[in-house]
Amino acid sequence: MSKRNPESLFHASFKRAMGRAAERLAALDPFARTWSFALPLAAPIDAKARESLPWSKRIYRNLAAQDWLLTFYFVALGLAVVFGSGPNRGMSLLRIGVDLAILWTGLAVVRGERIRPESFAGSLIYRLSLFAPVLLSYVQLREILPAVSSRALDAEILELDRRLFDFEPAIAWDPLVTPATTEWFSFFYFSYFGLLMIFCLAFLLVARDKVLIARFSFGILAVFCTAHLVYMLVPGYGPYKYLAGSFQNELSGGFFWRAVWDTVQAGGAMKDIFPSLHTAAPTFFTLFAWTHRDRLILRLSFPVLAFFTSQIILATMFLRWHYLIDIVAGLTLASCAHLFSLRVQAWESALRARNGVSAVFAPLELPRLGRGSR
């Protein structure tokens, strides 16, 4: 029985298009081959040809690297639940499906050009369709992580800490615990949420530099999506629970300690320790500000960011939420996401401009009134 040549399974025009795409990508940067599957910008096309493209092809042509990143993230979450061994997998799968539907509804409307991507509505819908599902998925991790597995690896994480560092900050700093020190670090631990909100809102709603927005967006989404997926591989409760009998001094403080405790109990995923997002996200912001210090606002904010980041990182261990290895993992994640976002967006921005595809992000600008309006 004769075997069919695999190449005969592909339409000739499709092969020619992919050949042209490979040549263009290789000409831009060998790194682009890694992402050649994600952005099928086979060749520049004129406006008339673009308008005649079917809706599905417009969506596919206009997708950005971060759109693929989030799609992979939610599919991976869903598969982890499907093959998980914990309770309430059906409800967790439903929640992930809703998140994915929110993402792709926005992509279908904006990337499919049902509304103009550069318009206020298009820009706003795209931003919401990216960040709202990721935020929802974090809140849902409280149910998703137990649905994937009931195990906790605190013993293994602690053993690794002791082998690598011969030091566990949560235990070593126990003699330093007082209401005053607890409140100090609680303030900075809680400031993480404000820092996250300020940075995201500033870049997504106020910033005008398209490339800068895209770099920030891809990087911070990579940080959160990677962390959420690794939580399923390395679940743990942290020293506050696993080492509860090892502490002599109880954590107690004022307003900020109560705020931290209530927030963690109400919305925390509980087994989300490796890597530390309280380390990764502020570190990413700090690296981003340093890299783009040619912008005055980022140059001025860098020292403040660096100080807050250092205190937030110390707080994660002082307040007994994280082991030292969690911090190392968070620093590594932030550094890799930052460097990768710079490389991806340098390539993607050039490729989209070359092939006549709209930028990943458009500045969010309010609609202007007509000339005759006052």
What would you call each of these model-derived segments?
Residues I198-L205, T279-I297, T332-R343:
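Membrane-interfacial alpha-helical segments at the cytosolic side of multi-pass membrane proteins
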Residues G238, I273, Q311-C336:
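Interfacial helix-loop-helix junctions of multi-pass membrane proteins
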Residues G122-L130, M197-P235, L305:
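Interfacial segments of alpha-helical transmembrane regions
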Residues H11, A22, A32, A38-I45, ...:
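N-terminal transmembrane-helix/juxtamembrane module of multi-pass inner/ER membrane proteins
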Residues F74-V82, V134-L136, F224-Y231, F307-M317:
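Aromatic-anchored segments of alpha-helical transmembrane domains
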Residues L229-D294, R299:
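Membrane-interfacial catalytic/cofactor-binding modules of polytopic membrane enzymes
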Residues T181-L196, A269-W290, L324, V328:
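Membrane-interface loop-to-helix entry segments
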